[in-house]
Amino acid sequence: MTKLFIFSTFLLCVWSTVVQGFSTTAKTALVIDNITGEVLLSKDIHRPIPPASMSKLMTLWMVFESLDEGKLEMHDTFKVSRKAWKKGGSKMFLREGESVKIEDLIKGVIIQSGNDACIVLAEGLAGTEENFAELMTIR
C-alpha cells in the first residue's frame, strides 16, 4: 500500500509538471527535445550572457566527441602546464608538470568545476587555449 501511495504521488508530480509546462527563473533558457528537435522552452534566447560554465560544457562535449571518434582514450594522459596550474577560481588542484588521465580531468571538470582541468584538456586537444577556443567556435 505504501509503495502504491509513493508511486501515485510520483506520477501526480510528474503529470502536474507536464500539464503546466516548463518554467524557469533563469534569465535565458532553451530546452530542445533531443529526439524530435522540438523546442520545449525558449526564454530570451538572443540575450547576450557571459559564457561562465558553458565553456566547460563545450570542453566536455569536445572531449567526449574525441573519445567517441577514437582520437582519445580515458586512460590517455595530458601534462599540466604552468598556465593551467596558475589558473585561479574553482580548481582541481593539479600540480604543474604532472600527467593526468583524461578520465580524472573529466571528473575534475564535472565535480570541481575545475578551471585548471579545462585548460589541461584544451591544451591537450588543441595545443593552446586560444587554438581550442577557435575549435569551439567552429564547432
Placement of each model-derived feature along the sequence:
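Active-site-adjacent loops and short helices of periplasmic peptidoglycan-processing enzymes
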Residues: V19-R139
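N-terminal signal peptide c-region/cleavage motif recognized by signal peptidases
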Residues: V14-V18
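Serine/threonine-rich low-complexity intrinsically disordered regions
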Residues: M1-T2, E73
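Sec-dependent signal peptide recognition
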Residues: T2-F10
